[in-house]
Amino acid sequence: MLLIYNIDMRLHTYLEHILGNKATISILRVLFNYKGKTFTERGLAKVSNLSNVEASRTVDQLEKFGIVRIQPVGKAYQISLNDRSYILNKIVQPSLMAEKETLDALIRLLKKHLDTKKIVSATIFGSVVKGEEKEDSDIDLLVISDDFDYATEVVANASEEISSTFGTRISPIIFTRKDFTSKARNDLIRSILSNHILVTGIELEKLK
């Protein structure tokens, strides 16, 4: 069950053994999101959506690199992050923090382009807001502006930078304020109103 590595892998070329598979990332993400909490192997496997065997094997490997601590408690084992770990603090934690802040960074970039007087409101909606996006999902963006040509231009500029920075695309909908108000009872607009994130401008509810 324990995986044995050459000692030089712990001080030199070891990243592929820590970050090289989905199970390891899943467990590290859970432990990071619930930092300070201890898990049993079974509990950690459940939250990480892994089998007990896969979770146990992965935890053993993480302990070998000093990233987690395993403490026997009765017949069970309790797992927690090793806060003193170099690998955790210098590599794993910054990576997970950057992942967690990706959406906020994307919103800031959008705001840089759309935070102007001619944009009445801009919001993102859809699968990204719900946390259900897939690899090929676009960023659904609703822009309200009474200057369609201007809005189209700034959205195109934002889309280009979003693509080069995040490797994803914007799927925009551009309405005038009047058009948005007239479509307020439309199923799509009602869906957007129920679940969106304001990027800049006036909150949608105030525009109905």
What would you call each of these model-derived segments?
Residues 124, 141, 170-172:
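A structural signal for short, well-ordered beta-strand segments
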Residues 119-129, 143:
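Short gly/ser-rich loop at a beta-strand->alpha-helix junction or flexible surface loop bordering the NTP-binding
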Residues 137-144:
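Short acidic, glycine/proline-enriched helix-loop-strand junctions
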Residues 2-118, 130-136, 148-208:
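Catalytic core of pol beta-like nucleotidyltransferases
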